Amino acid sequence: MKNLLGCSVKDLENVALNYGQAAFRGRQIYSWLYNYKNRSKSIDEINVLPLNFRNQLKKEGFIFGELILKEKYLANDGTLKLLLNTRDNESVECVGIPTEKRLTACLSSQVGCPMDCKFCATGKEGLKRSLKASEILDQILFIENEMNQKVTNIVFMGMGEPLLNIDELLFSIRSINEDFDVSQRRITVSTVAIPNMIRKLSEMSFQVLGKCQFTLAISLHASNQKTRETIIPSAKNYHIKYIIDDCREFVKKTGRRVSFEYLMLHGVNDKLEHADELSNLIKGFQCHVNLIQYNQIEEVEFKQTPSKNAQLFQNRLSNNGINVSLRKSRGSDRNAACGQLRQNAKIK
């Protein structure tokens, strides 16, 4: 199979030329593939193309995406979780999060995850494989088609560790920006932090994309190394001090602030002394803290921080001069919230 999803307009012009067609036929394919209001789901539906050209493309194995919708779950707040099957019969999940003026797509970069964070459902069954860029982009098509709305924002916060699939990640970002017409500034890449990869991400972004304007979000979740190691096993390989050093360098290179994701776990990392410790750790450079209320999952005994305590924690950070917000959880009643995505439909 030759997936056209992810092809640039120039790529598709070349496809047309290779089959004896005029270049504008490639531009027609491009429009029918990426234009939300004029999108087709298969080559057969592009009726502006000559029939013989459509038949040639199908005979040569060209397709418009390769994921298959298996299940969908609509939460009370309008959040939609989709369970998609790959051609090798693996499963991946993505989430559409609507608000009044935008639609955020939460995308997966891998089938499963190797990081085994103790508070997250995704890593419970380990990593199966990384996704191809076309499989990442296909998630956007499904969200737009199912929600009948154009995606305006992208967060790589679904299944998997994006920086362990960096080539396909950056190819996806290029297409999201240029083909799906979503500004890099509306794209967020979330990582638990992999040694040497934060620096590599900024370097490769300039090489592949020509710029680095997306938001880097670090899944920090602790104010010190000891606590972080207890909830994120991979933290043993990358000291929290060096993560912050690399983030400072990222800001210098890109001019973009770094976001720190901080999942509040009652009795683990949510005391005011942790807020002070976190403030001292990250002060002095352009950053923002996203406090996240824990979403309960099976097999895990962590408890959600009471709202009153979370507000006190937020106030302490703010009083310490840290830009901070308390993120409202979406879709938790359908296991579509942060930390609840997994490879199968066992939990519904």
UniProtKB/Swiss-Prot annotation:
Q: Which GO terms describe its biological process?
A: rRNA base methylation; tRNA methylation
Q: Which UniProt keywords apply?
A: 4Fe-4S, Cytoplasm, Disulfide bond, Iron, Iron-sulfur, Metal-binding, Methyltransferase, rRNA processing, S-adenosyl-L-methionine, Transferase, tRNA processing
Q: Where is the active site?
A: E93, C338
Swiss-Prot/TrEMBL catalytic activity: adenosine(2503) in 23S rRNA + 2 reduced [2Fe-2S]-[ferredoxin] + 2 S-adenosyl-L-methionine = 2-methyladenosine(2503) in 23S rRNA + 5'-deoxyadenosine + L-methionine + 2 oxidized [2Fe-2S]-[ferredoxin] + S-adenosyl-L-homocysteine; adenosine(37) in tRNA + 2 reduced [2Fe-2S]-[ferredoxin] + 2 S-adenosyl-L-methionine = 2-methyladenosine(37) in tRNA + 5'-deoxyadenosine + L-methionine + 2 oxidized [2Fe-2S]-[ferredoxin] + S-adenosyl-L-homocysteine
Give the enzyme class: transferase
Which SUPFAM superfamilies does the entry link to?
Radical SAM enzymes (SSF102114)
The cysteines covalently paired via disulfide bonds are C106-C338
Query: What Gene3D superfamilies does this protein's entry cite?
Result: 1.10.150.530, Aldolase class I
Q: Which residues bind S-adenosyl-L-methionine?
A: G160, E161, S190, S219, L220, H221, N295
Domain of life of the native organism: Bacteria
Its main subcellular localisation, reduced to a broad class, is: cytoplasm
Q: Where is the Radical SAM core domain?
A: 99-333
**One GO cellular component, as annotated:** cytoplasm
Q: Where is the signal peptide?
A: none
Role summary: Specifically methylates position 2 of adenine 2503 in 23S rRNA and position 2 of adenine 37 in tRNAs.
Miscellaneous comment text of the record? Reaction proceeds by a ping-pong mechanism involving intermediate methylation of a conserved cysteine residue.
Query: Which family, according to UniProt?
Result: Belongs to the radical SAM superfamily. RlmN family.
UniProt name for this protein: Probable dual-specificity RNA methyltransferase RlmN
